[in-house]
Amino acid sequence: MKDMAQEKTAGMSVIVPFLNEEDGIGLFCETIDEYVKTLIFPIELVFVNDGSTDRTEEILKGYRFEHVEKARLISLSKNYGSHAAIRAGLTQAGYDICTWIGSDLQEPLELIPEGYQKIREGYDVVYIEKETIQVSKANRTFSKIYSRLVQKYAVSSYSSGGISTIVFNGKIKEMLNNNIESNSSIMLQIMDAGFRCITIPMNFHERATGQSKWTMKKKIKLFIDSFVAFSFAPIRLVTIIGGVLFAAGIVIGLIAIINKLINPAVPTGYSTLVCILALGFGVTNISLGIVAEYLWRAYDAARGRPCFIIAEKKDLTTAE
């Protein structure tokens, strides 16, 4: 039993989720296969096809790794999103020490040995922080706003610099596999759990090929998921706004009564009434939407539907 436990911690499983990366998957495989030669421990690659519709899977199945100890392909039944794809990969990971990287080669591969070393030193979690990367002004602004809001209202331990990936040990892996959350952030779930951690800043690279699949729609969903799943701030905000509007309504009503008593000839404020009603109904609908987000996620969790469905598994290190 002890030998088996030591064997599981003697290497690292690297989860690689991808979506329509036919232009760059070959370069990624060549690069990481060559890099593995510099490592003193084995790694296992777990590729997760998150509903690709191009030739990425076909190219991957045709590639033959020379230095990677084990590589496997997990194909999901449809596109579930990168966080669900990572969770799917973790359920199939053979080693206790795990991480995930993108197939676009933006993450430095040096995070693999450095993260592994920190885990062997006794840390449970190693956060890889983006230090330098060329991104658009809009993406940089979104990242800063997201980081600050999450740090203040959801998970206080979240790095203001932004975390791209995480290296973690078997305790975290077991926790994630036993608590597979849908409509959630896997990074915030790890941070929210605590454990002994360390942050390593690293220089990231520009995307080698193709275009990013990280669309604004997906960013907005992550933003909503992060707060609804890990913070009561939206509900508290609704309560505060409701209290402020209630107080404002009383003040406006008193002012109207006093004005009428002082000067009966003062006309009734039709435009003021319309503005107040429009504001009130607008806030009410927004509040209902926020509450509905919580209710929907609670209902979705209660149904117990799977966060992902694995359609196919294939060993890429076994010749056909």
Where in this protein do the model-derived segments appear?
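Hydrophobic helical membrane-anchoring modules
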Residues: 2-9, 185-320
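Structured catalytic core of nucleotide-sugar glycosyltransferases
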Residues: 2-135, 149
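Conserved protein kinase catalytic domain
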Residues: 15, 33, 61, 87-90, ...
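Short conserved micro-motifs on helix faces and helix-strand junctions that flank
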Residues: 17, 76-78, 166, 239, ...
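Residues in soluble alpha-helical coiled-coils and helical-bundle/repeat scaffolds
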Residues: 20-23, 106, 110, 177, ...
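Generic structural signal for secondary-structure transition and capping sites
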Residues: 34-37, 98, 124, 154, ...
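Acceptor/aglycone-binding surface of glycosyltransferases and processive sugar-polymer synthases
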Residues: 74-78, 82-92, 97, 109-184, ...
